[in-house]
Amino acid sequence: MLNPILLAAICAVVSFFIGAIPFGLILGRVFNHTDIRKAGSGNIGTTNALRVAGPKVAALTLLLDCLKGAICVLIARPLIASVGYGFPVSIMAPGAAGDWMLGVICLAAVWGHIFSPYLNFHGGKGIAVGLGVILAWYWPIGLSLLGMFIVAVAITKYVSVGSLAAAIGLPIAACAVFPYSSLGLKFCMAMIGITVVWAHRSNIQKLMAGKESKLSFTKRVTEPDDK
């Protein structure tokens, strides 16, 4: 019978490739016949999809990116628990002995989105897929981070500020809510936060230079920001 740790590793690899699916790029081409990488920030995520392709493509991108992250966790949790030593699903819960295995799967899905092998290891910035995996992992933390994101964006009008706040808040929230969780889980949550912040490095530079674009549901762009 397959060892649950080996199965967790297999699930992580599969999650990486599921997380890597570039829905923003696909939807932009299907609905607008547009490559959203060639305008705005060049990113394949929800915000650039909104700026380049409009609200419909952006909403679908947000939904599908969240879903792909959630699906990775929701499928892996019972699958891993059902094999090997036959331990219960509860052992995969945050703070339980096997929680680190889901942490690895969460991290793999986010890394797949940011380092998509389908796009020569370029991709999005990990916010929507990150929300999906965290909601599926432990929804109260996911909703709290979503609330933090919404408040930060509402105050500043910068999506990147909300994204950075949520990314920094994730490992803090994970450690605060589950102080006795495994070191592996804490490491994975910290790595998700660090990687998302790293993916926003250009946004940080633009914020510091006063050149970051504010959120707009009506303004469209057809040229790259740096042109």
Q: Language-model features: where?
A:
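Helix-coil boundary and interhelical linker segments in multi-pass alpha-helical membrane proteins
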Residues: 1-10, 74-104, 135-141, 176-188
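Interhelical loop and helix-boundary elements at the membrane-water interface
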Residues: 2, 18, 23-73, 114-127, ...
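Residue-level signature of the transmembrane alpha-helical core
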Residues: 9-13, 62-66, 107, 111, ...
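Alpha-helical transmembrane segments of multi-pass membrane proteins
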Residues: 15-18, 77, 108-113, 149-153, ...
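Interfacial segments of multi-pass membrane proteins
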Residues: 50-55, 76-80, 108, 125-156, ...
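Helix-loop-helix "hairpin" substructures at the membrane interface of multi-pass membrane proteins
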Residues: 52-54, 58-61, 94-112
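A cytosolic-side transmembrane-helix exit/cap motif
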Residues: 122, 146-150, 183-189, 206-213
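Loop-to-transmembrane alpha-helix initiation sites
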Residues: 143, 159-166, 180-192
